[in-house]
Amino acid sequence: MKIMFVAAEGAPFAKTGGLGDVIGALPKSLVKNGHEVFVILPYYDVVDQAFGHQVEDVLYFYTQVGWRRQYVGIKKLVKDKVTFYFIDNQAYFFRGRIYGDWDDGERFAYFQLAAIEAMEKIGVIPDILHVHDYHTAMIPFLLKEKYHWIQAYQAIRTVFTIHNIAFQGQFDPGMLGDLFGVGIGRYEDGTLRWHDCLNWMKAAVLYADRVTTVSPSYAHEIQTPAFGQGLDQVMRMEAGKLSGIVNGIDTDLFNPARDPHLPASFSAEDLSGKAATKQVLQERLGLPVRADVPLIGMVSRLTDQKGFQLVLEELSHILQQDVQLVLLGTGDPDYEAAFSWFAKAYPEKLSANITFDLPLAQQIYGACDLFLMPSAFEPCGLSQMMAMRYGAIPIVHEIGGLKDTVASYNAYEKTGTGFGFDQFSGFWLTQTLLFALDIYHNHKEDWQTIQQHAMTKDFSWDTASLAYLDLYKSLL
């Protein structure tokens, strides 16, 4: 099977979040199953700086972006047996950042047109074309409405994945003619119209052969007004082709037995290195070195989505317990200031690191006993899976991917990989934490069982990719 991914970002070339992780890992796993896999990405300046000496110039052509005749350079790099093609146009992609420019609509309209036309130029016509988030959401529409006359494209089956429904790509409908070079008819008949805007994500949901989200629970949630961000009606209408597949994590990269960032390695069979890692982290962050105190980690963007309003609401109560908290992340300035204030008020209990530091993040996963992730909504979430891999037991709000990946501890059956609360409130966050602390202090055998279950749960992409393969095969 020939499978092609088109996305706005992908590790290790350009990455801002979970989408980049998926594009970096899923194709590798599909190749292991014997399939030909190709990825099309924009050639950003960050890609040029890090990989410019490795890429190969393949060809160039010009495409029409409405009335504009734009250069399209095609560059190529084979990595981990996956063939990456890059769309090169410095005017659009050498901006110093991936997203956030005033003309993002034009930039990604160009990218989608160039990617579609590039397939024929490079001679790669996939069986499955898998596009991701709003930046590539018009591709299924364009294949069926603008490029349907190209015979080679008629057998392509399309899959669209929603990583976060909050970002839908809503633009002025004049863009259809001005950038995509198609008529206004599909907007006027309501197909592409949503709240008096051209909605790229709606186009993908209607025109793609299959629609997926990054967890089964999120696939259900986005069909409700509470989580559908205005598209819940469309999601319910197309529910027959909607499904959820949980993301995986790179288990080679996130492996406490071989992680170069940890001062001591450990595994589910031998946890002695975890105690040593905890001691080193306490020393590094200026916390009292105590093996017996529960160390609670938080590695996240500091935003409302991640539930930090609950943490701040309850923090003075939590810090009355015999615990230590370690925070790593940046985000809302109000949250940054609040956690910095608490760290100064409770220097022996809270270390607030308002930055992003990957080695420190790995050490927090490796050192902590508990990991706090009370997200208000979470399409999938990766941090909770990384934490479990390192024996840091997650405390989560049972929503979206958190509900699908963390099995709440059952004291009677002695099962579970973490602790969860159903109602999004500070009270239940604190009650769940107190329950977890009771197990940690007073039921050591049960705690070790939870750790064993968490560390040995299979979150590998090799397993997650099988669900995608089943989906692809169902289309052929």
From Swiss-Prot:
Keywords: Glycogen biosynthesis, Glycosyltransferase, Transferase
Pathway: Glycan biosynthesis; glycogen biosynthesis
InterPro entries named among the record's database cross-references: Glyco_trans_1, GS/SS, Starch_synth_cat_dom
Any Pfam family hit: Glyco_transf_5
CDD domains xrefs: GT5_Glycogen_synthase_DULL1-like
Its EC number(s): 2.4.1.21
Reactions listed under catalytic activity: [(1->4)-alpha-D-glucosyl](n) + ADP-alpha-D-glucose = [(1->4)-alpha-D-glucosyl](n+1) + ADP + H(+)
Ligand binding (ADP-alpha-D-glucose): K15
Family indicated by similarity: Belongs to the glycosyltransferase 1 family. Bacterial/plant glycogen synthase subfamily.
Major enzyme class: transferase
Gene: glgA
GO biological process: glycogen biosynthetic process
GO MF: alpha-1,4-glucan glucosyltransferase (ADP-glucose donor) activity; alpha-1,4-glucan glucosyltransferase (UDP-glucose donor) activity
Protein name: Glycogen synthase
